[in-house]
């Protein structure tokens, strides 16, 4: 790696050195922003009154599902293709983004660069960004988070602990400090938001590792010290206590494909909404994590694993040999119809937007096939993957009978010995910060205002459309 060129700049915390990789990142962002500013101006001037969608009464009562009313730059979800990160599909990202030496999986820090700048980083830029993140992993800030987490009751859910840990890091927010002292303004908010985003990305792996070791060993500490020779995902895995390179590859994949899923989901929209009030990135992301912790959002992967384990128990209880695919298919078909006929749903199948197999599911499945998984759980999901679309189509109560990413993610983690189900959403959140922080920074760069939609009451609607006083 070439020697870093540095320049002196003044931030909220005083003088600091700006690395060349930061200069390159900002340069790419400003270049893109200049073009987009002209595009936005032209769109609003010529087509500002064009309706993107209709907000019906039905939609207002049904979670605003299907209403297009947000601009969110990092990613776009296509019902057929799946997620596009800066207009690149997951297979395209896997092809062009830098990987670890002798590795096959995308480096999450390279994905972060893509989300933040819209450009594919060089291998050198990815390495330099990783070095920048290591430099920003301030032990004093991390110790503050450790103290806060250690003070929580032992029974605290890992996602609660993660949210608390992020709030503890907020004490060191450069965005908040600059705003409070009058050093920032509308033209510089984005730079302070970027500073906080990078600091948070640098420090949250240690926080997440502490939470894992608190769950498994009862101590809020990392299993191994941070290693500046390792990439972001490998270093995190090492701090968890996992030394196997294959697991590191698994984490690179997991953390790179969960980074974003456009701006309308609960965690992304919550983060965006809170940040629109000029709350700093830590406050905004902590709010997003609280949304991610909900059973209908990030906890879905736990629900899938519970379902799979219950299926595994039934198979064993009925004496079905998991190596006998024909017998396993008959048994799982029977169990599935019993589940559906009881009014329940199959966890991990269906999606609010997608109408095909989630490409993230395909990535995880292909990883298992490449690494020759022979687990009973993998054999189960293989058969479920084969039979479920047909069963759900015949059942007729879903628009999408195909699997989403949650249908597979827990199986990988179980395979490598990360079996603590309550912890899985922390991994999701650790990854998701990359996308939502890119969204926050770009909102500030584009000068996006406070989000403030209008609400109505049932009484008002009844008076207007039913002509009945209430």
UniProtKB/Swiss-Prot annotation:
Q: Does the keyword Mitochondrion apply?
A: yes
Compartments annotated for it: namely: Mitochondrion matrix
Q: Keywords, A to Z?
A: Mitochondrion, Transferase, Transit peptide, Tricarboxylic acid cycle
**Coiled-coil segments:** none
Q: In which pathway does it act?
A: Carbohydrate metabolism; tricarboxylic acid cycle; isocitrate from oxaloacetate: step 1/2
Instruction: Report the GO terms under cellular component.
Output: mitochondrial matrix
The answer on whether this UniProt entry bears the keyword DNA repair reads: no
| Class of the enzyme per the UniProt entry, highest EC level | transferase
Record GO biological process: carbohydrate metabolic process; tricarboxylic acid cycle
Which terms in the Gene Ontology molecular function aspect does this entry carry? citrate (Si)-synthase activity
Residue positions of the active site? 297, 351, 406
Its EC number is 2.3.3.16
Superkingdom per UniProt: Eukaryota
What does the record give as the reaction this protein catalyses?
oxaloacetate + acetyl-CoA + H2O = citrate + CoA + H(+)
The protein's matches in NCBIfam families, at most eight in alphabetical order, are given as: PRK09569.1
Outline the subunit composition.
Homodimer.
Give the misc comment. Answer: Citrate synthase is found in nearly all cells capable of oxidative metabolism.
Family (UniProt): Belongs to the citrate synthase family.
Spell out the protein name for this chain: Probable citrate synthase, mitochondrial
Look up and give the organism this protein is from.
Answer: Leishmania braziliensis
Source taxonomy: Eukaryota, Discoba, Euglenozoa, Kinetoplastea, Metakinetoplastina
